[in-house]
Amino acid sequence: MAISLAEAAKLSNDVLLQGVIETILKDSPILQKLSFIEIVGNGLTYNREKTLPTAEWHAVNADWSTSPAPDFDQLTAALAIVGQNADVDNYIRQTRSNIQDIEAAIIELTAKAVRHEFEDKFIYGDSTGGTNQFDGLRKLIDLTQAGSQVVTMGGTGATLTLAKLDELIDTVRGGKPDLLLMSRRSRRKVTALVRASGAYMETVRGEFGDFTQLYNGIPIGVSDWIKDTHALTGGYETGVSGGSCSAIFALQFGEGAVAGATNGGLQVEPVGAMEGKDSSRTRIKWYVTLVDFCKQRRGALIGAQD
């Protein structure tokens, strides 16, 4: 069963872990929506449907032919390790904590750094070349070539239109997307286009008190890690720098769609006193990966310009 980080925090009796999870979730539309599957081992091997069997109409007492067997792609999402040490000098902690809890502040900042790194690799992660990362959306969907789940503005990119955004939404099957993930520039453009059409953007309050805009009833998630410098040639991406384009992702989350996988969940480990230094260490670590269960549950719009 997949469970969100927010629910995991509620089930934890560790106050420090709860605080770290809440820090990671706040201001992260990705982690607020993404659910995680707890696995055993160092990766998740799963089958993704490729070809369905066929069905036929039959006359009474007629022979039934054998349908071709369904075809699957067997894929493996290997866990990657993301984390960092939060080191606190004992002198500073003891003499400067009258104004602010120094240790809590450093742990909070380290947790934010872990969140930022996860959000970046959620989009741009690439497991090849010894990076120690998992594969992100850009690689899983493959924005470098034509595909049924890739909508392109064409050529070297073009100004975003609502018609193309609607086309992106229609690439996702089995219900509406749970999230439209885009850069701040793309969000501003969508807002301007909706206003120009005479409509308005509906807004709802989130779990953490923040306000989320909706397009066609779908929450818009703003990612500070989606670049507006993607480059296109012939309608498809050739790189993520040197251009003036951005990508927008339409995503469904959960088992059977886009999900995370983890072994042990997000962990906060009090390492304790450091040898040779008058400091204490807390380690935040996460054995995590991204799982793309079904191609039809996510899509991407590329070449979006202002």
Regions found by a protein language model. Name each.
Residues 34, 120, 126, 203-207:
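Short glycine-rich, low-complexity/disordered patches
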Residues 28-32, 165, 266-267:
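Short alpha-helical segments and helix-capping/turn motifs at coil-helix boundaries
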Residues 2-18, 225, 232-306:
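Extended, compositionally biased alpha-helical segments that mediate assembly or anchoring
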Residues 2-87, 107, 130-131:
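Assembly/oligomerization interface modules of large self-assembling protein complexes
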Residues 46-48, 108, 112, 183, ...:
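Hydrophobic alpha-helical segments involved in membrane association or supramolecular assembly
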